[in-house]
């Protein structure tokens, strides 16, 4: 199986400006993400940038750099521009890995690509079991429910499914495995072009979840439980310090 990894790496971030270039033990954050994409066995790794400073840093990493526009409203739109510039065949498997996840396990990059290759759905993603009550009721943790064949029924910031009887008890009782969606996607290149041609859907606007556009248009998304639970990405300076400490501990143990 052959697949391409595209890593969107925007320079601007409201919480952490210059995030792709943030130093983590002598390397920019984007370098750590690129290393994991290579370890996953991608046939090609492309970093989609919108700033020359990020492009310069990536050019030294031995992967492709694609300069993209600053007008995109979503990561998928940026991905579509990359697909157009590289003229990928419609059935090419594209894995979108976020540029702010320096600890992403290579195994789950390979897993989501393999899952797409073995399903009729045009898009695949992953989820992990929720084990913490705070996360279960946190709107920043996106929940997903699937049918018996592993296709998404719905993604929501709300707690789904709602365990009416279990949650009515004090303390709340869980009688179901709840799943948190993690933001890694695999697509067929042709489907990415189709996706960006659709208007924004009402559910997508309400939940602020772009994958709901796919379900709105009656297409399928394959969902599987991730082989490894990925550590959190980097959204804030505090997150960055946590990653630095984590990697520092690993280096000191070697």
Curated annotation (Swiss-Prot):
Q: Which Pfam families match?
A: CTP_transf_3 (PF02348)
> Reaction catalysed by this chain?
3-deoxy-alpha-D-manno-oct-2-ulosonate + CTP = CMP-3-deoxy-beta-D-manno-octulosonate + diphosphate
Q: List, alphabetically, the SUPFAM superfamilies matched.
A: Nucleotide-diphospho-sugar transferases
Q: In which pathway does it act?
A: Nucleotide-sugar biosynthesis; CMP-3-deoxy-D-manno-octulosonate biosynthesis; CMP-3-deoxy-D-manno-octulosonate from 3-deoxy-D-manno-octulosonate and CTP: step 1/1; Bacterial outer membrane biogenesis; lipopolysaccharide biosynthesis
Q: What is its main location?
A: cytoplasm
Spell out the GO cellular component terms annotated for this protein, sorted alphabetically and separated by semicolons. Answer: cytosol
GO annotation terms (biological process): CMP-keto-3-deoxy-D-manno-octulosonic acid biosynthetic process; lipopolysaccharide biosynthetic process
Q: Which UniProt keywords apply?
A: Cytoplasm, Lipopolysaccharide biosynthesis, Nucleotidyltransferase, Transferase
- Enzyme Commission code: 2.7.7.38
**Keyword rRNA processing listed:** no
Record localization: Cytoplasm
Against NCBIfam families, the record matches this protein to: kdsB, PRK05450.1-3, PRK05450.1-5, PRK13368.1
Q: Which HAMAP family match?
A: KdsB
Protein's name in the database: 3-deoxy-manno-octulosonate cytidylyltransferase
What does the organism's lineage look like at the top?
Bacteria, Pseudomonadati, Pseudomonadota, Gammaproteobacteria, Aeromonadales
The gene designation is kdsB
């Amino acid at each position: 199986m052959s697949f391409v990894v595209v890593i969107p790496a925007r320079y601007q971030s409201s919480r952490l400006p210059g995030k792709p270039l943030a130093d983590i033990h002598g390397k920019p954050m984007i370098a750590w993400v690129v290393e994991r994409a290579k370890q996953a066995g991608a046939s090609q790794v492309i970093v989609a940038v919108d700033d020359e400073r990020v492009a310069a840093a990536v050019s030294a990493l031995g992967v492709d750099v694609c300069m993209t526009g600053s007008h995109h409203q979503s990561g998928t739109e940026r991905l579509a521009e990359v697909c157009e510039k590289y003229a990928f065949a419609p059935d090419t498997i594209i894995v979108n890995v976020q540029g702010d996840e320096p600890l992403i396990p290579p195994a789950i990059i390979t897993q989501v690509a393999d899952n797409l290759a073995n399903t009729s759905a045009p898009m695949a993603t992953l989820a992990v079991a929720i084990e913490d009550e705070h996360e279960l009721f946190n709107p920043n943790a996106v929940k997903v429910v699937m049918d018996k064949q592993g296709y998404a029924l719905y993604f929501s910031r709300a707690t789904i499914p709602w365990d009416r009887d279990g949650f009515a008890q004090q303390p709340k009782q869980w009688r179901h495995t709840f799943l948190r969606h993690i933001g890694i996607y695999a697509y067929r290149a042709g489907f990415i072009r189709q996706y960006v041609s659709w208007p924004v859907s009402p559910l997508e606007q309400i939940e602020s979840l772009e994958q709901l556009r796919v379900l709105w248009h009656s297409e399928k998304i394959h969902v599987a439980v991730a082989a490894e639970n990925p550590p959190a990405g980097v959204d804030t300076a505090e997150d960055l310090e946590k990653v630095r400490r984590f990697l520092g501990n690993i280096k000191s143990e070697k």
